[in-house]
Amino acid sequence: MSDANPTAGLSDQRKLLIFGVMAFGQFMALLDIQIVAGSLGSIQAGLSAGPDEIAWVQTAYLMAEIVMIPLAAFLSQAISTRWLFTASAALFTISSLMCGLAWDIDSMIVFRAIQGFTGGAMVPTVFATGFAMFDGPKRAMIPAILGMVSTLAPTLGPSVGGWVTDVADWRWIFFMNVIPGVAITAILPFLGKVDEPNLSMLRKIDWLHVGSLAVFLGGLQYVLEEGPRHEWFTDTGVASAAWISVVGAVVFFERTFFSTMPVIKLTPFKRPTFAMACVLNLVIGFGLYSATYLTPVFLGRVRGFTSMQIGGTVFVAGLTMAVAAPIAARLSTKVDGRYVIGVGFCFFALGLWMFSNITSNWGFFELLLPQAVRGFAVLLCIVPAVGMALNGVAPSELRYASGLFNLMRNLGGAIGIAVVNTWIGDFARTHTLRLSESMSDNPEHAGGLISGLTAYASRFTPDPAIALGQAQSQLVRIVGREAATLAFADVFRLMAWIFIAALVIVPFCKPAPTDGPPVSEH
């Protein structure tokens, strides 16, 4: 194949159009990771699914996506970026339509898995394409644009899904993908070549490597998703999945190092800055997805907010991300990226620490500043991290580097949600015990609460025994609510310390210059 860059003959306007169409496809794929989060109850009722079954609507997507993200590099080399993205957009659109038409929970799980698998191909290819096509100031904007897309989409997902479900029907959270998906599929093939295919690679594909990748990452994602719900390794299914994942990992790494045609190359990790940027991206994914998950859960569980109210509250983080994107891009071209990401991590930690003062009365206005600080900080974190990871990568490794970098953020998110779910449960039980002990040690205070609640209940029932029972039940709910609130505060505080600890890595990163020519993909 030629070393020439096929995009060199394209005008800047055509390059921007290609990149814009692909970035929009990436936004759709990332939005659909979390879009069902605010609508699971409605989907469960609509498909007559059980509590354990409905969780697979999310798990199936994530398991399939995490397998495809690193695999996309090989496939884009084999059939070209243009046709991989087009095929992925087409199948993503069809699977979205079928999710909306799902007739039972089993069909929904199958179509969500296809949706996740095809969506996973669109995420890393956009990063590689952006860095391949542009140079100088335009390339410097790529991390900002894609950073905003990759953080804004999962942040807005629960809000968009909840809003659509409230005003229409849960099926429309999938139907809404159809028109833009058809447009992307129809337009992209005619915009121009990004690279040339190498179909001979398909004849030499190492299927054992592909299979072990699926078993390794799919099993790991299953353990992280299902572990918190089933007491981790005390559950036979989770323990079995963990062992299967370990076996898959052993085979995967053996094939990675010894296969004549590996589907994934780990050579980008030879660059220390790339490796450290991936670790930082893991932490960013941990904080981004965990905080995005925790805030709606708090508002729903403790405050009893509706999907619309939750969406209106968490939308603040998305707005500040949009504001921060051009600022982060500008700073990354003018200031050493290590300073930018250092400030970003400090502000992210500050935003999380502000959440640690949370009370059971917090709503939109109390959450406004912590969310704004966190939303602004995440772009200061991710924009220089993308630049550190992908600037200076050898042309032959750019696709693989992009896939690995994006994989680390998704893994960070999966680990984060699993960990914070476990922490919430453990801390809530601890605080419930402490609050109960405190009330036992202060019987006069507890008696006063019971008397007040009984007097209030007596206004609605003439039977003193019923009123007392209602008062005791209400007290139990109050203790549970306050224990949950204290647990959320503890989790946000621990997350803040994780970001502070990660600052140790930043000084050892060496950002590459952004003013070089576009890299060739071949």
Which role fits each region the language model picked out?
Residues 53, 138-145, 397-404:
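Cytoplasmic loop-to-transmembrane helix junctions
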Residues 38, 69-213, 226:
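Helix-loop-helix hairpins in multi-pass membrane proteins, especially solute transporters
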Residues 178-196, 214-226, 244-258, 503-510:
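C-terminal membrane-cytosol helix-exit motif in multi-pass small-molecule transporters
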Residues 153-158, 162, 291, 367-451:
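Small-residue-rich alpha-helical segments with characteristic i,i+4
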Residues 2, 8, 39, 410-511, ...:
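Hydrophobic transmembrane architecture of multi-pass small-molecule transporters
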Residues 103, 135, 191-195, 228-229, ...:
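Short helix-capping/hinge motifs at transmembrane helix termini and TM-loop junctions
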Residues 197-203, 261-267, 430-438, 514-522:
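Short, Lys/Arg-enriched, Gly/Pro-containing loop segments at transmembrane-helix junctions
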Residues 14-73, 77, 96, 106-108, ...:
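Transmembrane core module of solute transporters
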